[in-house]
Amino acid sequence: MENVYGSTPKERELILRKEKVVRCTEMGRYLMGFFKIIIAGIVFAVITIVASVILYGVFAASSASALVAGGKTDGLAGDTGIDGFNVFLIVVQSVALLLNLAGAYFIIRMNKFFDGFKTAGLFYIAQGVLSFIMVFTSDGAYMFFQTLSAIMSVVYMMNFAITMSKALEPTDSYLSDEWTKLKKIFVYLLIASGVCIGICIVPGLAFLGLIGLPIICLGFLAMSVWYIVLVYKSADSMKVVAKREADALSKEENAALA
């Protein structure tokens, strides 16, 4: 950031406008990079689900064939098939972790413009690392890391939405408000989830909780889509603002030289 102290009011305004162009240009690039990582993650998740169904059937058939051929019933002959599927899961989670780290890189890079992105990025990494660790755990440990991962996701979403709202406030008040709305709806869904889970353990009211949970899940799904759309719109908004401001500065400089 250039030193504006000692400059005339007009010079200070010019410096701040140039910094605005740089900030919006870079943030637009980082947000678009993050958006592409999100889309890549979704595509990878879909491919993984399809591949998991196919490979699980293949490995299960391989295990069954090995048991029949070996004439064993203790399950040892089927270890190869089980191990093969476990290796597949480890590879999948490794790729997911790499995508997570790539996304965190773009988030943390924006911290030089607005405080809060680094915190959001670190929680984003924590969620990805915990999800990776879950592959190597089982039973109680799995639930423990799954719970921690969910908590990290919640903290990330809150920090990211709040910081995005602040970052867009000077250039796009509409999108800034949309990020604030997203955060509020996220909080409402979390509260509703807690209420439904609580109702599920109350005798005679469990059916109400079971009815409410699927609706809340649909709410989280809709919110996730909205979140992705907002990331894209925010990236596009930053690029538009940067171009508009750069064009205006260029015209003013040309007019001054004429």
State the predicted function of each range.
Residues 11-13, 64, 73, 202, ...:
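Generic N-terminal initiation segments characterized by hydrophobic and/or small/turn-forming residues
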Residues 1-24, 69, 239-258:
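Low-complexity, intrinsically disordered extramembrane tails and loops of integral membrane proteins
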Residues 160-164:
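Acidic, glycine-rich loop-and-strand cores that form catalytic or ligand-binding grooves
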Residues 165-194, 238-250:
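Membrane-helix boundary/juxtamembrane motif in polytopic membrane proteins
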Residues 22-63, 81-106, 111-159, 180-235:
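Hydrophobic alpha-helical transmembrane segments in multi-pass membrane proteins
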Residues 64-82:
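Perimembrane loop-to-helix junctions flanking transmembrane segments
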